Amino acid sequence: MKYLITGLGNIGEEYRNTRHNIGFTVLDALAKASNLVFTDGRYGATATLSLKGRQLILLKPSTYMNLSGNAVRYWMQKENIPLENVLIVVDDLALPFGTLRLKGKGSDAGHNGLKHIAATLGTQDYARLRFGIGNDFPRGGQIDFVLGHFTDEDLKTMDERVATACDIIKSFCLAGISITMNQYNKK
């Protein structure tokens, strides 16, 4: 069985390790733990993780955030992956830093990457793992905040939160969304 795990982010060194790129950060950690290397391909860089008979296609789109749907649709079609086996890892301003929430569907919550994925796929009924980045910014400072780097305080627990996000991804693929939500959403 195949799964498409897409981490949202923007390409380019200037965006590396920014809050908006937490999706890339999580997938990098998942790949590194299994000694996988991403290979550049159409619409993004991919790595394939084998996990107990399942194939997880890890995708970091090269389309920029607000065109992420093109990459998701292409890889779903190329790998013949059904919508229920798609998981998007995304930053979330509405959640305190490090809070992780798995959802089976929902609104885009103003996130342009999710908005484009929903428009491209014609539905909002796809799973997403929201990684809280907090919202400690002044009025009108949202763009600078999401494109900024994590604070020293955030970095103290970053590795542990990213590791938990990786565990959630694996559980999503092995145990399913309901069990995974019940296990992790209360933490």
Swiss-Prot record:
Q: What is its main location?
A: cytoplasm
Q: Which residues bind tRNA?
A: Y15, Y64, N66, N112
Q: Where is this site: Stabilizes the basic form of H active site to accept a proton?
A: D91
> What SUPFAM superfamilies does the record tag this protein with?
Peptidyl-tRNA hydrolase-like (SSF53178)
According to its UniProt record, the EC number is 3.1.1.29
Q: Offer one example of a GO biological process linked to this entry.
A: protein quality control for misfolded or incompletely synthesized proteins
Sorted alphabetically, the keyword list is: Cytoplasm, Hydrolase, RNA-binding, tRNA-binding
A GO MF annotation of the entry reads: peptidyl-tRNA hydrolase activity
- Which family does the UniProt entry place this protein in? Belongs to the PTH family.
Role of this protein: Hydrolyzes ribosome-free peptidyl-tRNAs (with 1 or more amino acids incorporated), which drop off the ribosome during protein synthesis, or as a result of ribosome stalling.
Q: How does it assemble?
A: Monomer.
Identification of the protein by name: Peptidyl-tRNA hydrolase
What is the organism of origin for this protein?
Answer: Phocaeicola vulgatus (strain ATCC 8482 / DSM 1447 / JCM 5826 / CCUG 4940 / NBRC 14291 / NCTC 11154) (Bacteroides vulgatus)
Q: Which gene specifies this protein's sequence? A: pth
